[in-house]
Amino acid sequence: RRCLVGSEMCIRDSFLPRNNFDAQETCRTIVESELTKSNFSIYGWRQVPVNPKVLGEKADRTRPEIAQVLFKHNNKDLSGKNLERKLYETRRKIENEAIKKSLSGFYICSLSSKSIIYKGMFLAESISDFYIDLQDERFVSRFAIFHQRFSTNTAPSWDLAQPFRAIAHNGEINTFRGNKNWMKVHEQEMDSNLFEDIENLKPVIQPGTSDSAALDNVCLLYTSPSPRDIS
């Protein structure tokens, strides 16, 4: 069994439409195509082991297929912030292709060389019961960010569960509509020589997101191109 070691190893954790195998295959094709175009080598897919018995009736009924793909960039010198920037743009390209094909039930929880997002519609104390990986003693991390949030102004769903890719936030943003409209205006002026094509990053705020998910979208835009931190 090969051991894949190194900070340049990347993992994409995602939700796929569980009961539509044709859509699943389309999702996988889009992911592999965009990763290859971005000069990544794919090691393979992995079905994330889960225990659905800990879920409630609605959560189980709407439960997605959860899959990871392991991959690595072919440029060994690409690492750290530069690699994360490349991953950010690649994720946006994948998401935009999925929108073009009207794929529902597809959501990228994380695409990173630094972090993996585990999320879902279950009680906080059930996270390691549902995600069996978290029971494995070989599964280690320098730190973990945990957040529990009950949906108030949007219908609960797997993709809108906390945490998001950059933040864990309670939402309740009263200026959400205005901020969203202003972001749309600012998109027209966006420019950067750090990305392959700035159009790949638009729309910054993805359609159908909650207020905290929209904030996450914007945080990633501002932190991915530069050494800025969120604070």
Predicted regions and their residues:
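Single conserved hydrophobic/aromatic residue that forms the stacking wall/gate
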Residues: R1-G6, Y222-S231
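Active-site loops and adjacent core secondary-structure elements that bind or stabilize anionic groups
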Residues: M9-C10
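Short, flexible loop/turn elements at secondary-structure junctions
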Residues: P17, H147-T152, E172, K180
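A short, surface-exposed, charged and often Trp/Pro-enriched helix-loop connector in the C-terminal portion
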Residues: N20-T29, S33-A59, P64
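Short acidic, glycine/serine/threonine-rich loops at helix termini
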Residues: E25-C27, A155-L160, R177-N181, V185-E189
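Active-site pocket-lining segments that scaffold enzyme catalytic pockets across diverse folds
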Residues: T62-T154, Q162, R228-S231
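Conserved phosphate/anionic-ligand binding catalytic regions in large, soluble enzymes, centered on
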Residues: F164-K180
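Conserved catalytic alpha/beta cores of large enzymes that bind or transform nucleotide phosphates
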Residues: N174, M190-S224, R228
